Amino acid sequence: MNSMSENFKIRVIVGLILFIVAVVALYTFDGIPLKIMYGFFAVVAAIELLSFHKKKRTIYNIVLSLIELSLLVASTFFVSGASRIVIWYIIFGVPGYDIFAYFSGKLLGGKIFKKSRPFPKISKNKTWEGTIIGLLISFAMVTIFYLVRGEITTEWIYLFLPVLALVGDLFESYLKRKFNVKDSNEIVIKNKFFEKLEIIVGGSNGHGGFLDRIDSVAFATSVMLLITKIVV
């Protein structure tokens, strides 16, 4: 088995384990364990972000870092006060997009649109196949969940989560490009405990660090926090 196939298998296993852990945590003690877990991820991601400055430090990059840090803080605030229903919207709309975009990109990338890339200047690895399929499937999941709920409320705003997930992912890719960082796992904390956690969340073998794991969630939930303050 080649390294790509092995990494793909690891990604599947890690994804399933994290999903099971998240669901169990969501339905234990009113979801407090899940919110604590996300808060921990956000803190470590923030530390990773701060260490970007060892690569390239400019005023523009500092501003970008402050924006990303603000997103991490805002998203933690949003998730900490979110209900189980909202958490499910987030799971379907954000990690849902990330997962299906990744797998469809790996399996079908380049087979339909060949060498054409949707965002070549920001993320060369993203494919049209992965982006489109990821958006369609995650949007379908969020829409079905919304229709099954059958409530005509402000929950319709969560239908935009897949698009926000894509934008958040692109922003983090742009951030790494500006800092000349190929992957977030280049700048992880040099500590055995955190190194093991990096492996657990898929932060080795080119999968990125903690920031890669929650970049889409941070952006999407921050925007949701702003929208809910305006709409609700």
Regions found by a protein language model. Give the residues of each.
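Disordered, low-complexity tails and leader-like regions
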Residues: 1, 30-33, 42, 59
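Interhelical loop and helix-boundary elements at the membrane-water interface
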Residues: 1-16, 47-220
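The first (N-terminal) embedded transmembrane alpha-helix
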Residues: 8-25, 38
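Short, hydrophobic transmembrane alpha-helix segments
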Residues: 21-35, 52
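Hydrophobic alpha-helical membrane segments of integral membrane proteins
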Residues: 34-39, 89
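Central hydrophobic cores of alpha-helical transmembrane segments in multi-pass inner-membrane proteins
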Residues: 39-49
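Juxtamembrane boundary at the C-terminal end of a transmembrane helix
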Residues: 226-232
